[in-house]
């Protein structure tokens, strides 16, 4: 056991986690040169295209150290993006140490800090590593000082390497062996294994990635899942070297997979504990805290007969992505679908793309909303995540919106732009600290503003240098109202949104104009109105198409033309009473893209 090292790699987006893991795999000979591929561990097409890691992946490597002993390294590559921070905390729960990778050109960024504190909270040993020293703008001395100054861990003799060229990778491996403690656990105690991740394979059923804390899990053992109390037999156990490799047993301290032919999707939830069916452990291991979705949106299949497939797809995804929340919802405009809870906008985009790609669905999404706390005049408090569920205005005593604490790290020269942006987003400044060339600003911002387009705007005002990390702190009273869109006097439920009163004019006008472009002209006038309660705040009209009925008149009396025009008018009037307007799919998407 003292030859096992479990660690994960944490870093800000694009500081080279995945490339470093590729090098470690190559040096330890996990894959032959032919199978070696850039970013081996980012197995989803989506991850490769966007160049980001979404799911944490695990690998077991053998490393012969300089002292001649052979060590087993289990490491987990983690995502760097703020929306996936729960993936990081799950991976860290299975480790004794973490490599904090910092780009020697960019220096410390907000996510570096956030992930590092998560690791320190879990009592892990954090080992700093300066990556990308081959870059001309790399300045390892300055960055090492920055790590000590901002993060507060000793970094003067941090390993310097370049994952791209392979310089210093041996030093990284030596540091892992020396500085990360071996796992503690009792091989003779009853089995306790933590499920770090699980995914659904259509041939094998549920595949679970586990970390053995105590005891041993052998192939053919009968084990039980502690939360459901169900018993299963371990058909196969083994490790990833990135390839699936079967073994006869997983020992204490190891990380590996278990396949037990569990068919129902929620048979082995993430964060659960496995133990043996006979004389097993009494109590489960402390799991992870459940993450609460921050953003909700309605998602509907374009054709209603895809509803069943959509539900199956969501079930399979939710096994793999523990943070996904969904419940059925129906809308008069869009038919049946689901209300889905996400951790942020990137998460929402990724889930939607995965559903469309991996499960071949055509989907349409309504505007995302955050959860509001509503105090009713009757004294009860309700939580609303769908504009359609908002009670009537006269029943509401007070609306409270979620506030997040946003930590932004930005170079001095862009500070002004960032502050302007935060003020525009109704933020209040809490703190500002200068660290050399970087400034750390803390703002309290309404989550609804952060969710919409804050991240993109932050990146563009700071030329991509600012970085952001945020978490929910409390609900604050705010003057929020529901903006409805009426088409010919009928409310379209899927277009409603909850926004701050100061924005309604601007937002209403923009929406109405946008809808006017997108709704095709009919034989009668279509009135598009934006309303708050019963007050109309903006209107535009899609003009009717009309036939030139007087074309065949040649000369003659004006009353002849009048007669024809009046006849046309009558017809249009009748048509307007019975006609209904089809709102095209693009119009729903327009609501999402309003800010552009």
UniProtKB/Swiss-Prot annotation:
Start and end residues of each tr-type G domain: 2-184
Single GO BP term: positive regulation of translation
Reaction catalyzed: GTP + H2O = GDP + phosphate + H(+)
Entry EC no(s): 3.6.5.n1
Disulfide bond residue pairs: none
Pfam assignment, any one: GTP_EFTU_D2
Cross-referenced Gene3D superfamilies: 3.30.70.240, Elongation factor 4, C-terminal domain, Elongation Factor G (Translational Gtpase), domain 3, P-loop containing nucleotide triphosphate hydrolases, Translation factors
Class of the enzyme per the UniProt entry, highest EC level: hydrolase
GO molecular function terms noted in the UniProt entry: GTP binding; GTPase activity; guanosine tetraphosphate binding; ribosome binding; translation elongation factor activity
Keywords, ordered alphabetically: Cell inner membrane, Cell membrane, GTP-binding, Hydrolase, Membrane, Nucleotide-binding, Protein biosynthesis
Binding site for GTP: 14-19, 131-134
Entry's Gene Ontology cellular component terms: plasma membrane
PANTHER family: TRANSLATION FACTOR GUF1 HOMOLOG, CHLOROPLASTIC (PTHR43512:SF4), TRANSLATION FACTOR GUF1-RELATED (PTHR43512)
Main function: Required for accurate and efficient protein synthesis under certain stress conditions. May act as a fidelity factor of the translation reaction, by catalyzing a one-codon backward translocation of tRNAs on improperly translocated ribosomes. Back-translocation proceeds from a post-translocation (POST) complex to a pre-translocation (PRE) complex, thus giving elongation factor G a second chance to translocate the tRNAs correctly. Binds to ribosomes in a GTP-dependent manner.
NCBIfam families assigned: lepA, small_GTP
Protein's name in the database: Elongation factor 4
Protein source organism: Shewanella oneidensis (strain ATCC 700550 / JCM 31522 / CIP 106686 / LMG 19005 / NCIMB 14063 / MR-1)
């Amino acid at each position: 056991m003292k030859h096992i090292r479990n660690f994960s790699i944490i870093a800000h987006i694009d500081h080279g986690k995945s490339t470093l893991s590729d090098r470690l795999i190559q040096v330890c000979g996990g894959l032959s040169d032919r199978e070696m591929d850039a970013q081996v561990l980012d197995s989803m097409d989506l991850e490769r295209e966007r160049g980001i890691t979404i799911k944490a992946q695990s690998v077991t490597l053998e490393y012969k150290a300089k002292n001649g002993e052979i060590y087993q390294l289990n490491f987990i590559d983690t995502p760097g993006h703020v929306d996936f921070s729960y993936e990081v905390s799950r991976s860290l729960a299975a480790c004794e140490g973490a490599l904090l990778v910092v780009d020697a050109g960019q220096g410390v960024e907000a996510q570096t800090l956030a992930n590092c504190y998560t690791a320190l909270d879990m009592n892990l040993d954090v080992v700093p590593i300066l990556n990308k020293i081959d870059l001309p703008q790399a300045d390892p001395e300055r960055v090492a000082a920055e790590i000590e100054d901002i993060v507060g861990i000793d970094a003067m003799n941090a390993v310097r390497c370049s994952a791209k060229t392979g310089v210093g990778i041996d030093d990284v491996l030596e540091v892992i062996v020396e500085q990360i403690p071996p796992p503690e656990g009792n091989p003779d105690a009853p089995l306790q294994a933590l499920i770090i991740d699980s995914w659904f394979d259509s041939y094998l059923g549920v595949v679970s990635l586990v970390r053995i804390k105590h005891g041993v899990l052998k192939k053919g053992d009968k084990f039980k899942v502690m939360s459901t109390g169900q018993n299963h037999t371990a058909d196969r156990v083994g490790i990833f070297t990135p390839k699936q490799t079967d073994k006869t047993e997983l020992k204490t301290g190891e990380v590996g997979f278990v396949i037990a032919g569990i068919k129902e999707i929620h048979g082995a939830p993430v964060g659960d504990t496995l133990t043996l069916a006979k004389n097993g452990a009494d109590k489960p291991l402390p799991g992870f805290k459940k993450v609460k979705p921050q953003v909700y949106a309605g998602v509907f299949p374009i054709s209603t007969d895809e509803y069943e497939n959509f539900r199956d797809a969501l079930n399979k995804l939710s096994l793999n992505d523990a943070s996904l929340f969904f419940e059925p919802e129906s809308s008069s405009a869009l038919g049946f679908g689901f209300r889905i809870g996400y951790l942020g906008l990137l998460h929402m985009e990724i889930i939607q793309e995965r559903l469309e790609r991996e499960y071949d669905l055509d989907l349409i999404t309504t505007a995302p909303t955050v959860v509001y706390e509503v105090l009713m005049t009757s004294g009860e408090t309700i939580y609303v995540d769908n504009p359609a569920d908002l009670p009537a205005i006269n029943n509401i005593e007070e609306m409270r919106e979620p506030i997040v604490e946003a930590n932004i790290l930005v170079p001095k020269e862009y500070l002004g732009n960032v502050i302007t942006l935060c003020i525009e987003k109704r933020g209040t400044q809490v703190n500002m600290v200068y660290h050399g060339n970087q400034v750390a600003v803390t703002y309290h911002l309404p989550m609804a503003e952060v969710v919409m387009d804050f991240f993109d705007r932050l990146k563009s005002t700071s030329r991509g240098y600012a970085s952001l990390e945020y978490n929910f702190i409390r609900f604050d009273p705010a003057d929020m109202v529901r903006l409805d869109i009426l088409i010919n006097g009928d409310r379209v439920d899927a277009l409603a949104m909850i926004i701050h009163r100061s924005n309604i004019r601007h937002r209403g006008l923009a929406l109405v104009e946008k809808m006017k472009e997108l709704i095709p002209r009919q034989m009668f006038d279509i009135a598009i109105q934006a309303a708050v309660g019963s007050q109309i705040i903006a209107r535009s009209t899609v003009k009717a198409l009309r036939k030139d009925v007087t074309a065949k008149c040649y000369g003659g009396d004006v009353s002849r033309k009048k007669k024809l025009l009046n006849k046309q008018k009558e017809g249009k009037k009748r048509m307007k009473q019975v006609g209904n307007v089809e709102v095209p799919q693009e119009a729903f998407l327009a609501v999402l893209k309003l800010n552009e």
